[in-house]
Amino acid sequence: MNIPEILDFLKRLSENNTREWFQEHKAEYQNVQSSFENLLATIIARISLFDESVSHVRPHDCTYRIYRDIRFSADKSPYKNHIGGYINARGKKSNHCGYYIHLEPGNCMLAGGSWCMPSNMLKAVRQSVVDNIEEFRSIVEDPAFKKYFPVIGESHLKTIPKGFPKDFPYPEYIKCKDYTVAYVIPDSFFNNPLFIDEIVSVFRQLKRFADFTNYTIDDFE
């Protein structure tokens, strides 16, 4: 699991994002893919100790294709410059919250939550936050959680959404357009021989947030 080698390959791919270069380095990419799946296998095994719902997940099913869909994009680069894996008990296409690891030179992260929820599901999660605000705050305002995830949601409304009390005392928690969290890590993170332990610590905190949101999300799936 030589993560610096994976990052080095991705850096060179971003500088030579052509089919010709990729074909010339296809064997190297296959080694990168194998190494990344080995990393995921290790993480899955460790997460399963506190979240047995992911114990059946296979590394191959967590990974995303490196090929970009360029049909509707002005950027015709054929390959992504990152590699990612989403450890999700219900599959990587589910709205169910899981554990995401993203490797990209200069933009690595550990993340999770639910992106692009249908509007009725998003409304239900917001309502759950309102109805259980003290429980939600006990999770997201816990220093152990905020150490990794100081912000809830990637994008936010400017005002409280329609149908919710305008005087709600914690508006930032229901203005979220998504319920996701992310911990950005430097490339040097992986130089630490104990980086797996740190990843597990991050995801252990993430589980608390995931459990709260999944309680509502799973009613829709």
Predicted segments, located by residue:
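Short His/Asp/Glu-rich catalytic/ion-coordination signatures at enzyme active sites or charged loops
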Residues: 2-31, 181-195
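Well-ordered alpha/beta subsegment
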Residues: 3, 138-142, 218-219
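Compact, glycine/acidic-enriched structural inserts
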Residues: 105-164
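Charge-rich, low-complexity terminal tails
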Residues: 168-221
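Aromatic- and glycine-enriched beta-alpha-beta binding-site module
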Residues: 71-130
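Contiguous, amphipathic alpha-helical segments that mediate oligomerization or scaffolding
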Residues: 5, 15-50, 201-220
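Sequence-level motif detector for i,i+2 pairs with an aromatic at +2
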Residues: 61, 80, 107, 176-178
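Extended cationic-aromatic binding surfaces that line active-site or macromolecule-binding grooves
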Residues: 35-91
